[in-house]
Swiss-Prot record:
Listed GO MF terms: ATP binding; ATP hydrolysis activity; ATP-dependent peptidase activity; serine-type endopeptidase activity; single-stranded DNA binding
Active-site residues, Swiss-Prot/TrEMBL: S906
Source organism: Acanthamoeba polyphaga mimivirus (APMV)
GO biological process, any: chaperone-mediated protein complex assembly
Span of domain Lon proteolytic: 810-1003
Similarity comment: Belongs to the peptidase S16 family.
Binding site for ATP: G515, P516, P517, G518, V519, G520, K521, T522
Lineage: Viruses, Varidnaviria, Bamfordvirae, Nucleocytoviricota, Megaviricetes
Top class in the EC scheme: hydrolase
Keyword entries, A-Z: ATP-binding, Hydrolase, Nucleotide-binding, Protease, Serine protease
Name assigned to this protein: Lon protease homolog
Protein EC: 3.4.21.-
Length: 1023
């Protein structure tokens, strides 16, 4: 055998050893990777063993391949023509040549391995490692790229950001890998390679706020590699602290996010920002871009301010019912606060000592994900309370020693703590133990006024115009998102928030929302709570008569407990809260005394509500309610106690206009109903005209409750038709089966007997249709929509039950259109009829006797009397002298629909005009209506509102006369409901009855000479 031949075999042997060592290193790296995943709670012991088993098989395969290759190299027959005589000099020369060849082989392998051009003895090992890495990741990013592309992969990068690459290859742990080939139309070898970081949700419990994808594009080989994994712990935050020199990427994320927070989230305290960057685990800076990082800082700050304002018992209740990431966030942000906050974090952490996920305790997982500085803080506080909390083994807050609870409650007044300790010592075997424990628990859970307002949002923004303005804008935005309309209410709330910003310690406010049922008073209260970020508690007062329900029973009573006010404050868990008292005008009296109003007067007095007392505590405890925003809702302010009403800032909630109702139905109600019933909203077509038709013909309300019920009734019936292929679904079936024989299915829509469901028989069309088509129609997996028509509305809701009062058919003497408004904000016309009275005796001394019918109440009756006097006085003396002869028994005044009570002064000018018409015997234009209170002088006075004009147009009225003093109300309605004044409805503004009765558009063929000349002359002068 020649030396030359031995040299070639040595080269092959060296190359084999090199490859063997390379794959051995990769397998060992994968072994370490599996151990790291197990240690970091990414995989359990079973999955780790599966990976180890696969790696063990790879080692066995690799040894087998190596032995086979060695045998093949050294068992080959030597070349007989080779010379056996080689000098030492030639050996050195040849060794140099072999070495060069060996290096070139390795170089070729590194460059061309990407296309598998070199036959690698261990290629099967390589492929198995790549396959294993797809679902389990790899030791490092660069190890995998070296395996997949070749060790000389860096030479293939085209201007890649190597600093960022070097950073992430040192800290990022891949958990799964996907490889995509760049499509031909996007290939460009001159294009710069990129490395992109994107945050992703964690897929396992052990990883909290450190998961992301690292995507690397390599344009030279048309490949994109996506690594999904997590950033390994840098608990010292060394990378972040040295980022100014070490990493431009991290330094940019840190500084840019801080800038964005200051500009976009000015309410975030600068001290918190600085503390946050120092204490937070730097993993979050690796996985977030600057915008995302700024959002996270704001989110954590809002959580921090929320937690520091709550009492500890409330925090515990929320904490133990949260998921692991939320628990981590609670502890993480509390550790950044004051000593009291850190103490609370330690208490929460100890609650998790015995709680596990799999074989790992939640406390270990949370501790592992904290930064080093927070770990030290947590360790210190745990050691300081270890002896006191050593016996805690459950998650119930009741088992925490009461002394420790009191120590953690820095906001609780000292006299309250003394009271609790005193009552706690009294708890012995006896019948009052339950009440004593209730008294203690109530005080422990009550949200006392914070002693330190430094963490209060308003204190932190009050001196910055930008922060204050942005906060107000944010409140307004949240209100608009929560509540539709009600602009005046929102303005009042903005003013209140403005007061709180300038004086964070100022008292709350008492707001009264007055309006008809169903217009969103409760929703507005919820919107206030959401916009301010404070809790809402609701107290229903309807039918309540006993003040003890609100302020508690005396402790000595059997079954005594504290009242609803204290109970709702405990439920809210925050000194700043919204307390909503619903149906205030529906409370009941007790022994001719309204105890409820007396209690409400007490809690709304700003001088007294700081010392509110509950009878259950025998006047020993003062509860501070000064931070509560009290909101009352009622339908009418007339029923409220004047003293209580005087303390309320009243906001009138107007009924929704037709346009608003349609918008609410289309954008909210139908969407919600479709979701609840199981329809795709896009597949249900209920046009605005149909919604308007349902509103006008089937509902009589200020809000949208009945409208929602009617729409729900329609959709529920449509849903039943879906099961039986009836109605609109039958029509779709006919459309998709035009050639299929069908029958008349109309009877199924009319059928309402329960037997139709029991004895149902499919139609001939359904029997002859393709089942696949039927299922597609059933699931609305088609291009067509279900269109709700008037015909379907009639079938589902029956014929309309409401009728609109229309104007009389002809112009008549003594008959005029008055206007009415209901308690629900609806309006319309009410015909007023004045005729000669044929009952009575003109000689009985009761000249011009008035007979009033139609269920007219006291105020309306007085208005009729005033109208008659005014009508007579405006006529000339000649006509006056003939009235008694013409109407010997006076007048009969009637308002049709006697079953409906009618009251109020707003028909005064209508009565007057009708009297004038009856006396003169001249007809009144049937297309005219009017409203306004009449005075004896003929002046028309202001009425309560103009909502009664809303029904005039529907009734056929073309012209409405209103009082000049109501011009502002007219402008509001015109702005809110411009559609009312379209298509020819004219509004005339008047000040005196003369302007109406002398108008030929009102009384036909009227002659100005019929009236008192002096009165006409005086009116013209004033005009």
């Amino acid at each position: 055998m020649t030396e030359n031949n031995y040299g070639i075999r040595d080269i092959k042997n060296q190359h084999l050893k090199y490859s063997y060592k390379k794959y051995t290193d990769l397998i060992i790296g994968f072994e370490k990777h599996a151990k790291r995943m197990y240690d970091d709670w990414v995989i359990d012991i079973n999955n780790r063993n599966i990976i180890m088993h696969k790696l063990d098989n790879l080692v066995r395969s690799m040894i087998k391949i190596y032995n086979e290759c060695i045998m093949e190299i050294y068992n080959k027959t030597p070349n007989e023509n080779e010379s056996d005589n080689i000098s030492n000099t030639n050996k050195k020369i040849n060794n140099a040549i072999y070495n060069k060849i060996y290096n070139e082989i390795n170089k070729i392998e590194r460059i061309e391995n990407k296309n598998n051009k070199l036959v690698d003895s261990f290629n099967s090992i390589r492929e198995q490692l790549i396959e294993l890495a797809k679902n389990n990741g790899f030791h490092t990013i660069n190890d995998f790229i070296g395996l997949y592309v070749g060790e000389n992969y860096e030479s293939l990068f085209n201007n890649l950001d190597m600093e960022t690459f070097e950073l992430y290859k040192g800290v990022f742990v891949p958990l799964s890998i996907s490889i995509n080939k760049i499509k031909k139309k996007y290939r460009d070898t001159d294009k710069q390679d990129t490395i992109t970081i994107s945050k992703i949700p964690s897929k396992c419990d052990g990883l909290i706020e450190n998961t992301c994808t690292v995507t690397i594009t390599m344009n030279n080989i048309f490949t994109e590699i996506i690594f999904e994994g997590y950033v390994s712990a840098d608990i010292l935050n060394a990378y972040l602290r040295t980022s100014q020199i070490y990493s431009k990427h991290l330094f940019n994320v840190k500084n840019e996010s801080k800038r964005i927070v200051k500009e976009s989230y000015p309410h975030v305290d600068e001290y918190f920002i600085a503390k946050y960057a120092k204490l937070i685990n730097s993993n979050v800076y690796f996985i977030n871009n600057p915008d995302e990082m700024a959002t996270k800082i704001d989110s954590d700050y809002m959580l921090f301010t929320d937690l520091t304002a709550k009492n500890f018992n409330t925090i515990v209740k929320e904490f133990v019912n949260s998921n692991l990431p939320t628990m981590f966030s609670y502890i993480n942000v509390l550790l950044m606060g004051s000593n009291q906050d850190v103490n609370n974090a330690g208490l929460l952490f100890n609650l998790l000592k015995d709680r596990k996920i799999g074989s790992e305790t939640l406390s270990d997982i949370i501790y592992h994900n904290l930064s080093f500085h927070l770990q030290i803080k947590l360790k210190k506080i745990i050691n300081s309370i270890k002896n006191e909390l050593g016996k805690i083994r459950s998650l119930t807050p009741e088992e925490i020693p009461i002394e420790k609870k009191l120590a953690s409650m820095v906001n609780m007044p000292e006299n309250v703590k003394n009271y609790i300790i005193e009552k706690n010592n009294e708890i012995k075997t006896g019948e009052n133990n339950y009440k004593l424990q209730m008294a203690i628990n109530g005080l422990m859970q009550f949200p006392w006024k914070p002693k330190d307002f430094n963490n209060n949002n308003y204190f932190q923004i009050k001196n910055s115009v930008t922060k204050s303005r942005n906060y107000l804008q944010n409140v307004a935005k949240k209100l608009n998102e929560t509540v539709f309309g009600h602009e005046n209410s929102k303005k009042v709330l903005i003013e209140l928030v403005g007061k709180w910003i300038q004086n964070p310690e100022s008292s709350g406010q008492v707001i009264g929302l007055v309006g008809p049922p169903g217009v969103g008073k409760t929703l507005l209260a919820k919107g206030i709570s959401a916009a301010l970020g404070i809790p809402l508690s609701i107290v229903g007062l309807g039918g309540m008569s006993d003040s003890a329900d609100l302020i508690g029973h005396s402790f000595t009573y059997a079954g005594a407990q504290y009242g609803m006010i204290v109970r709702q404050m405990i439920k809210a868990g925050n000194w700043r809260s919204v307390m909503f008292f619903d149906e205030v005008d529906k409370v009941s009296k007790r022994n001719d005394t309204n105890e409820i109003y007396n209690t409400l007067i007490h809690i709304t007095d700003p001088n007294m509500n700081q010392n509110f007392q509950d009878r259950f505590y025998s006047s020993a405890i003062d509860f501070d309610l000064s931070g509560v925003l009290i909101v009352f809702s009622y339908n009418s302010s007339e029923k409220l106690d004047p003293i209580l009403l005087d303390r309320i800032k009243e906001i009138k909630i107007s009924p929704y206009s037709l346009k608003e109702k349609i918008l609410i139905a289309q954008n909210h109600v139908i969407k919600e109903l479709c979701s609840n019933i199981g329809f795709d909203r896009d597949k249900i077509n209920i046009g605005d005209d149909i919604v308007e038709y349902i509103i006008e013909k089937y509902t009589m309300e200020a809000g949208v409750r009945e409208l929602k019920r009617k729409l729900e009734q329609i959709l529920l019936k449509v849903n039943i038709d879906r099961f039986y292929m009836r109605g609109p679904f039958y029509n779709l079936l006919k459309k998709y089966n035009p050639e299929t024989q069908s029958d008349d299915n109309s009877h199924s829509l009319e059928e309402n007997q329960i037997n139709m469901y029991v004895d149902y028989k499919p139609s001939l069309l359904e029997k002859n249709s393709d089942p696949n088509i039927i299922n597609k129609i059933f699931n609305l997996d088609i291009d067509d929509h279900i269109i709700i028509t008037k015909e379907l509305v009639h079938k589902y809701l029956d014929k309309p039950t409401l009728t609109t009062e229309e104007i009389h058919k002809t112009n008549m003497i003594g008959v005029i259109n008055g206007l009415y408004a209901t308690s629900v904000g609806m309006g319309g016309i009410v015909p007023i009829q004045i005729y000669k009275n044929f009952v009575g005796d003109k000689n009985d001394g009761s000249n011009l006797k008035l007979k009033i019918t139609g269920n007219q109440k006291q105020v309306m009756r007085e208005s009729v009397m005033c109208a008659l006097t005014t009508a007579v006085n405006v006529l000339n003396n000649s006509i006056k002298s003939k009235i008694l002869d013409k109407f010997p028994h006076g007048f009969h005044v009637h308002a049709p629909d006697g079953g409906t009570p009618k009251d109020g002064p707003s028909a005064g000018c209508a009565f007057t005009t009708a009297f004038v018409s009856a006396i003169l015997g001249k007809k009144i234009n049937r297309h005219v209506a009017m409203t306004g209170e009449i005075e004896l002088t003929g002046k028309i006075s202001k009425i309560g509102g103009l909502m009664l004009t809303t029904g005039a147009k529907k009734a056929g009225i073309k012209c409405v006369y209103i009082c000049e003093d109501n011009k502002e109300d007219y402008e509001i309605i015109k702005k809110k409901s411009p559609e009312l004044f379209q298509d020819g409805l004219e509004i005339k503004i008047v000040n005196h009855i003369i302007e109406i009765i002398t108008d030929p558009n009102v009384i036909i063929d009227i002659d100005v000479n019929d009236f008192d000349k002096d009165l006409i002359s005086e009116f013209k002068k004033l005009k």
